[in-house]
Structure formats: structure tokens, C-alpha cells
């Protein structure tokens, strides 16, 4: 009995075991299918799509091959049970331009829930037949070349949770049908040409992230937004929004980030409607037209970590309400009309790491304070105010200051010696003050200093050789002081140095030493003009300046233009992702300089790393211009004017194909202007005046558009008719020149004399040729 029961139990156990073995495995146990999972209609639709949407097999990890289960193809995901294609991710995979047509095979994949065609070189309009993909929850068509209006049919895809259309050329209004997308949690329309329709978004109660930035919106949500109770981040920067600040945003307790910079909002601002449970950590309303005082109600935003009120018209004393924002790590109220004393709370222990108060009218740093060790300040910008008196010693008590900008103020006295003991300095900008004395021996105990700008002061003495220890030095500007020293050959070994400006000091002596390696392998900009440098330069002088022959891999830019940058946030600090510019530490700073560029004094607020400049003007250099200058193929600006260079203009200059400015004026150059310079297509400013040049001026568009003054002082030049709009003849020696009336009388006489001289030989040659012809005429006929 017991045995039979045991057999019965064993039989049941085996039956249950085989039953579970026959069940399909869940998708969690992802192993390659032993048989084809993909449905034939789905496979055929994908193969048809491949014909209209070029996808090179070489860039697919798993190529689309008819003999392979389509569910294992690259970018394709299928339902594990039904074999329907539910996800298609082909981002970055199309190498040729294509457009989505209404009849596209894509719309046969009607079970798709995820569609990602970002960065696929798509062109044309979004077809209305996209509504066939009724199961879509995620749609990403970002970073393409799509045009036209967004089809209203997208509003029928009521399962959508995610729409990303950024980085296209879409225009018009947001379709009213978007009000049906009640499950939508992310909508990204960044960088298009939308102009309106944002009012419909007030119905999207599931929205968590909304990005309308970089469009042409004008009216901002006339409807109440407080119903968007799930909204966490809103980006509306770089539009044309007008009117008052949308106070209804402050009622949304879930909101974490508000970015409304670079619009045309105006009027006073009030934060009185702020929710008591506000989670707001970032508020950026910079670059608008807000007026009045910074409101005291700002203190209600107790969780703020980043506050940017810069580039507005706020006025009055510094706002004390900010001192109550105990979580604040980054504060920017630059470019306003604030005045009085610098707010005291920035000197006290807090979480503040970066503070930018520049371009205001602060005139008092406050009484001497003892900065306690709890202060975490890393970046401080007080530039372009009216601060005066000596730089206080206690500024050195900030143990971790990484960046300090006191430029464009009225500071006097010497640089505090304690600064040389600061071990964490990366950037020190004291430009345009009335500081005097000697430069301190910086980089004695630290090698972190990357940028030093002490231009436009009254410093004397020599350039401190301790700067040789600054291993990371990229930028050094001592322009407009009274420094008397020889050329700093010892800086040539700094492999990081990109910008060296010694202009308008009292530097003297040669800039070449046969026993010293010149170095400067990464130098992009050197301006040593208006000093007392002398001597000749060897022909291989520029051979080691390899950076000026290196192509910077970016499209040509307008270097003086201050273009926008993408910001990345680390904690409370914002760093700028702008490696294309010299000085990329904080968004409050980029290295800047002024330069005589294209004949005009130009301020460069940011310095593009591909900007290559040599300015040796206003010295006493002699000898020939080195041929090796032609090796610097990426040089944009060359100024050797106001020296004593002799010899010919080196033809190798024609190898500098990107050259935009060439100034060789006020030298002793001779010979002809190389015709090959006329082939420099970017050359827009030329000055060869006041030399001893002769011969024809090259005929080209670049030379033909120059001012006549670019060639004056060269009596041997001719061919300037088109440039100077007047007749230029081959010059006659002074002793043979006469006044105009005498020349007119002599001209007919000279013409008759010339005719008589030519008549005699002409008659003689005629007789000789005639005799030969008549003597040998019969032989010619025989030969024929």
C-alpha cells in the first residue's frame, strides 16, 4: 500500500516536472532563441525599411540578414512571446540623407512602443501617418533636419510618455491635439523654430520635464500652470517671452529647476506665491529686463542651490535675503546696478562655492573680517566694480580659492605677498587696476596656476622666474606695465603655454639665443609688440611652433563673437563644456584679451583655441623675415610692422592658407610682392605701406578690395589703378621730372623721334626679306 502510494506520488511529480518544462521561459532568462521568433510580416517590413533607410551593415553589431531571426538584428527588440517588433533604435546609424514618407514600411510596425531615429540625417516633414504607431510610448526624432509643422496626428498617440524633437528645424505652433497626451512625462522641443501653442501644455498634468528652449516663443503660458503638479524641470531659455515672471510656476511644489534666461521678461519680480513645500534647487532668470530691488521674498526658496539673476536691471543695495538661502552653492548677480558694500555673507561660513558680483557698482569690500575655516568659496568674481584701496590681506584666508577676479576696479598698492603662498590658485585676474610694485614670486609652493592676467597696471621690475614652476600655465598677460626685462626664454619649456602677451612694456634685447631652445610647442598667441626687442631672426626661428601649424578640428568661427555654451552642473557649481576656448573652469570666467585685429582694437571676451596670432610690431627687429613663417599654416593674424626688416617678402607666406590679416608696413622691405599671396582666399586686411617695394601689385579679389593707404610709401609699386581709382605710371627719376605743361609740349616731339628711329631699320629689313623671297620663290613652287 505504502509502495503503491509512493509510485503514485512519483508519477504525479514527474507529470508536474514535464508540464513546467513545456512552459515558455520568461524573457528574464535571455538566451539566444533556438528557433525563429520574428514574425514574417515584421521581418519583411524591416527589410523593406532597410531599402528606404540606408543602414550600412558594417556599423551594425548584428547586421540585418534575411537568414537570421530579425529579433536578433541590431537595434531591433521583439516581444518575447508574440514575436512582434516593439522597439526600433537606429540612432546614429544612417549615413545618407533620407526622409520618412507616409507610405514608409516603418508604419507597418504597428506594435512599436519605442522608436528612436535620433541623429539619423532625416530630412523633410514628419508624416501624419505616424499615427499608425498607436502603441508608441517613446518617440525620439531628435538631432535631424526635419522641417515643417508637427502633424496634429501625433496627438492621437495617447500612450506617449516621451517625445524628443530637439535639434531640428520644426516650426509653427505646438498642435492643440497635444492636449490629449495626458500620459506625457517628457517633452523636449529644444532648438527648433516653434512660435506658439504652448498654452495647450497646461493640460499635460503628467509632465515632469518640459524643454522649450532655443525657439521663438513669445507669449508664456497665459493659463495657470499650477495644475502641472508633477512638473520637475522647465527650460524656456533663449526665446522671446515677454511680460511678467510667470508666478504660477512657484505654486508647483514638485518643481526642481526653472531656466528662463535670455528672454524679454520685464517688470519687478515677487516670490510671494512660492509654495511652502517648494523643492526648487535651481532658478535662472538671467539676461532679461527685470527691474527694482531683488525681492526679500526670495528667502522663501530655502532649497535653492543655484541662483542666477545676472544681466538684468536690479538696483539698490545688495540683497540680504540671499543670506537665508543656506543651501546656496552658486550665486550670480553680475551685470546689474547693485551698489554699496559687497554682501557680507559671502565672507562667512556657508555652502557657497562660486560667487559672481562683477559688473555692478559695489565700492566697498566691507570692514576687515576674519574669514573662518568653514568658508568653502572656490570662485570669486568682483571684476568691473568701483572697489578701491589696497587688496586686503585677509583675501588670502580663503584656503580653497581656485579662481579670483578683481579686474577693472580701482585697487592700489602692491599685490599681497600672501597670495604667493596660496597653493590652490588656478586663475588670478588683476587686470586694469592701479596696482604697482613688483610681481610676487608666484608658483613657489604650487604649480597649479593656469592663468595670470596683470595687464594695465603699473608693475615694475622683472618677470618673476618662479612662473617657470607653473606646469599648467596656459595664459600669461602682462600688457601695459613698466616691466623691464629680457625675453623670457625660460617660459619656452612650458608645454601648456598657449597665450603670451608682453605688449607695451620695457622688454629689451634679442628674442633669439643660439644656445637656448626656443620651445613654445603649444603657443597659439604671442604679442610682444611695442617693446624694445632687437636683432635678427634665423630662418628656422618659427620651426618649433607646431601648434600654429595644427588644425583645430572645428568649423571656422567668428572669434570675437560671444557664443553660448552648454553648462554642466557638478553639485552647486556649474562648469562650462567649452573646451574650444582658453580658460574653461567656471561659467563666470574665460580668459580674455584685447588685440589690434584687422586694424581695429578688438576685445576678445573669449579666446578660441584655434585662434593663432603673431604680433612682433613696434620693435627694432632687423634682417630678413624668416622663411619658416610659412610653416605656420594655421596662422590667422601676422603683424611685423614698425620694425627694420629688410630683403624680400618671403613667398612662403602663401602657404599660410587661413591668413586673414597681414601687416608688414613701416619696414625696409624691397623687391616685389609675391603674386602667390593673391591666392590667400581669407586674406581681408593687408598693409605693405612705407617700405621699398616695387613692381606690379598682384591682381586678385583680396588685393583689389584694399584701401589705397595699404600701399603708400612704396614709389616703385604700380598697377594700383583699380585700388586707388587713379592713374599710376612707371615712376621717372626726380631729375628728369618736369611740370605738367612741359610734358604735354614734349610728348608729340618724342613720338616723331621714335617714329624716325624705327623707320630706317624697317626699310632695310623690308629690302632684305624681299630679295630672299624673289630669289627662292621658284624652289618653293617646286616643293609644292
Swiss-Prot record:
Record's signal peptide: 1-30
All ranges on the Extracellular side of the membrane: 31-752
LRR repeats: 109-133, 134-157, 158-180, 182-204, 205-227, 228-251, 252-276, 278-301, 302-324, 326-349, 351-373, 374-400, 402-422, 423-446, 447-470, 472-496, 497-518, 520-544, 608-632, 633-656, 657-680, 682-705
InterPro entries for the chain: Leu-rich_rpt (IPR001611), Leu-rich_rpt_typical-subtyp (IPR003591), LRR_dom_sf (IPR032675), LRR_N_plant-typ (IPR013210), LRR_R13L4/SHOC2-like (IPR055414)
The entry's keywords: Cell membrane, Glycoprotein, Leucine-rich repeat, Membrane, Receptor, Repeat, Signal, Transmembrane, Transmembrane helix
Residue spans crossing the bilayer: 753-773
Xref: PROSITE patterns: LRR
Location(s) in or outside the cell: Cell membrane
GO cellular component: plasma membrane
Hydrolase as UniProt keyword: no
SUPFAM superfamilies: L domain-like
Residues linked to a glycan: 132, 180, 193, 203, 273, 327, 421, 432, 513, 544, 562, 639, 655, 668, 679, 687, 707
All ranges on the Cytoplasmic side of the membrane: 774-784
Disulfide bond sites: none
Family: Belongs to the RLP family.
Protein name (Swiss-Prot/TrEMBL): Receptor-like protein 38
Organism per entry: Arabidopsis thaliana (Mouse-ear cress)
Gene from which this protein is expressed: RLP38
